[in-house]
């Protein structure tokens, strides 16, 4: 999913889709000097989703962020981690938290750029709303079949069922590559921005991207 999100945020909207650019908020420093304004703060997520969809911001419910960003936010008491009690009755934190009423998934698969002599490291956070990712079943050539092994355990019958599921970012269209495409796209094809195009009013797309230095 993170690779798909990275791909669609690489799409450049034009004409009626030009406002797609408002769904990305980049607060990262242009140099190696990083201040509080370049990091995730108390109002960063709220400001980013308001910029993206205006009065549709109540749809947002889920945040994917890097552990570096999550650690900084927890240190500022802006992020609360959920807890569970293990078999030894010891309370332990989960890598799932809450911020601004939204569920936070901490995943180091979120895009990052390494620091170099000219710029500090950057971290990408994704914010998703209800219906941002659509799920649907895909066709299966043989959805179910019955097999029998007469020599096993006095005769053994097994019912085999198969399912295929798809997920798709709402508001975007995927174009099948002209080469290398078989029954379904590869991870690399899904991660390629060139295979995606925006087809819906950006204000109706409950996705936001935030780039910070922590």
State each model region's role.
Residues 33-71:
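Amphipathic heptad-repeat coiled-coil/leucine-zipper-like oligomerization helices
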Residues 28-43, 75-214:
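Sequence/fold signature of self-assembling virion shell proteins
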Residues 1-22, 53-69, 104, 144, ...:
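Long, contiguous amphipathic alpha-helices that act as assembly "spine/axial" helices in icosahedral shell
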Residues 10-49:
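Cell-envelope/extracellular anchoring and linker segments
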Residues 1, 46-50, 211:
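Short, well-ordered alpha-helical packing segments
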């Amino acid at each position: 999913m993170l690779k798909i999100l990275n791909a669609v945020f690489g799409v450049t909207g034009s004409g009626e889709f030009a406002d797609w650019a408002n769904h990305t908020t980049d607060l990262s420093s242009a140099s190696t000097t990083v201040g509080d304004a370049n990091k995730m703060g108390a109002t960063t997520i709220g400001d980013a989703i308001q910029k993206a969809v205006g009065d549709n911001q109540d749809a947002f419910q889920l945040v994917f962020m890097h552990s570096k960003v999550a650690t900084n936010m927890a240190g500022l008491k802006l992020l609360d981690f959920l807890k569970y009690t293990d078999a030894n009755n010891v309370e332990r934190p989960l890598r799932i938290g809450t911020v601004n009423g939204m569920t936070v998934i901490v995943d180091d698969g979120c895009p990052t750029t390494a620091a170099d002599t000219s710029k500090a490291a950057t971290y990408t956070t994704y914010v998703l709303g209800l219906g941002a990712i659509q799920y649907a079943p895909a066709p299966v050539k043989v959805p179910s079949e019955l097999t029998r092994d007469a020599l096993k355990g006095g005769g053994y019958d097994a019912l085999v069922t198969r399912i295929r599921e798809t997920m798709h970012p709402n508001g975007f269209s995927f174009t099948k590559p002209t080469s290398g495409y078989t029954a379904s796209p590869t991870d690399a094809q899904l991660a390629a921005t060139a295979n995606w195009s925006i087809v819906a009013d950006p204000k109706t797309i409950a996705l936001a991207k935030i780039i910070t230095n922590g």
